[in-house]
Amino acid sequence: MTILNHNPVYGATQKTATTKVSSATAIANTDLDDTPTGTALLLTAPAGGCAVTRLTGQLVEPNLATACQLNLYLSKDSGTTMRRLKSVAHAAYTWAVTTAPATDDFGYTESAPLRLEASDRLYAQVRAGTAVTDAFAFTAEYAELVPDA
């Protein structure tokens, strides 16, 4: 049986959300789910939900030169419980005027977006061996979803 979508949903408004995240010293492997520490709120989905089409993290603090892990969490209860959605590795980088730090892409695209329901929240976290304040900037590009009237 074929199920037809009689109420298509379209992206109405393109938006961007951003946050800076500090790296916490030695976040334990057991601190990766449910109630992780050192997270920062990146995005709260609007009333109609949204489709995240790009999500990146970029090193912005020159005092963090070690490799680290960038984590993305989803919360459906206003941040009480967070589930890790995805992690990307950030390679070690030494600041120099002739090079730029890499932008780490979480892999969401317009053809393969991360769909969020109304009020879902995305949180970002950096796991590194060195504590650095505001070490990474996370950016989410998304489209607010509105049902076709």
At which residue positions do the language-model features occur?
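Short, charge-rich binding segments
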Residues: 62, 112-116, 131
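C-terminal interaction-tip segments
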Residues: 1-40, 44-47, 117-121, 126-149
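Arginine residue identity/basic-tract feature
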Residues: 54, 83-86, 115, 121, ...
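Beta-rich globular "head" domains
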Residues: 35-76, 83-86, 133-147
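General helical structural elements
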Residues: 19, 24, 58, 87-88
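Terminal beta-strand-rich extracellular "head" domains
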Residues: 67-112
